[in-house]
Amino acid sequence: QGFCGLTEVIGDLCHWHRKVDFQPPSGFNDVGRVVFETSERVLEYGVEQDYLEIWQRLPDSVEDPWVNVSAGTDTAARMMQIGVGKYFMHVRPRAPSLPVADLEHDLDALRAWVDFEISFGEQTADGTRRILRSTLPWQESLILA
């Protein structure tokens, strides 16, 4: 799973408003009840679905937050990078929207549907960014300018 969007916090409930999503719509709102177990660990309990997620803060991930957004009318040109400390995420949505129903299996269409990037990486002291994990495996170990 992976998405990029906005988080709305009301009391102990978090509502995630997905602007771009790696998966097709599920029919459920993304709402979780959060419990701060420690200053380094958050437990998230599903409200509309039954799940538990455990979020653990990574070392070196508390300073120097930044955001870089490239917006445009062409979906393929949209991109977002966010970072904090020595870590960053890079998100680029697929150009076509995922269909609600199965369509004929056209190879080019299938390739376009999976062309959605969410990459997680690490930034070194000199500013070099290297992708560690990605929805596009060939991006892993790539150095970003």
Predicted regions and their residues:
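Lipid interaction determinants
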Residues: Q1-G2, L13-A145
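C-terminal extracytoplasmic interaction modules
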Residues: T7
